[in-house]
Swiss-Prot record:
Broadest EC class assigned to this enzyme: lyase
Gene Ontology CC: peptidoglycan-based cell wall
Signal peptide residue numbers: none
Cofactors (names): NAD(+)
InterPro entries cross-referenced by the UniProt entry: dTDP_Gluc_deHydtase, NAD(P)-bd_dom, NAD(P)-bd_dom_sf
Superkingdom of the organism of origin: Bacteria
Originating gene: rmlB
Pathway it works in: Carbohydrate biosynthesis; dTDP-L-rhamnose biosynthesis
EC number(s) given by UniProt: 4.2.1.46
Protein name, as recorded: dTDP-glucose 4,6-dehydratase
Family: Belongs to the NAD(P)-dependent epimerase/dehydratase family. dTDP-glucose dehydratase subfamily.
Bound cofactor: record note: Binds 1 NAD(+) per subunit.
One GO process term, biological-process aspect: polysaccharide biosynthetic process
Amino acid sequence: MRLLVTGGAGFIGTNFVHSAVREHPDDAVTVLDALTYAGRRESLADVEDAIRLVQGDITDAELVSQLVAESDAVVHFAAESHVDNALDNPEPFLHTNVIGTFTILEAVRRHGVRLHHISTDEVYGDLELDDRARFTESTPYNPSSPYSATKAGADMLVRAWVRSYGVRATISNCSNNYGPYQHVEKFIPRQITNVLTGRRPKLYGAGANVRDWIHVDDHNSAVRRILDRGRIGRTYLISSEGERDNLTVLRTLLRLMDRDPDDFDHVTDRVGHDLRYAIDPSTLYDELCWAPKHTDFEEGLRTTIDWYRDNESWWRPLKDATEARYQERGQ
């Protein structure tokens, strides 16, 4: 298969490209990435001889059309994704997440190419901490941040292009990912690299917020299953049913790194911080016979810690600037 992977130098996209090269050696993979601060050429160094990397913006209609015309399918990861950055400046999120997705949709419509669009559970808003309900495919959208609002808008565009123009597209909404190649601005790698650089870990507020954690390799195996077997027009929710509050995650991480589990600082909470995310993935499990493999969270966290220990040259150039931005916000 000739695959075009947008955002393939970012966290989840990089891991998808690595798995495609490893598990589907007959795929011809082209990566389109703007190589911004969160998309790094170094993340693809191990597979650079097996792929084609094109540096470019997904709002560049001419470039996108050319690359889509050469492809059998597009897996659309490219997005601005860090909520704190969206709160500071939402404009890049509108540009990439909405206009970029529109540009991709017009190209796949023009050339009749299959599309899978990657989205987030944050489009559904949040759940109460004491409410055992979970998000399903029929949960109404209720985004609460500029980031999630732009992703919700992108999802709606995909659905409209499927219905109005017959575009062959699927959507997946996934829970919080962790694993290798994740930028140090994100919760888990920030804490790991804080410990590794002698800084104190930081926890927003009381740490009661609950996230539904999934290893990035499980997310990407589900994406591949949907790409290969998913029903056109369908939305699939991806989760390994790994709900944990942030305080528990941080204490587990510190214990695995041989640190006092209470050796961290509480910092100013994020504005409008969503309380709880939880996904019901039963449609994906039942319809496409998919199941996660990385169900032992501690083991997944341990291997992630080991990756950051072993790959300091990858994250060290990012660390000081990231912490400086957090310090400006009192976080």
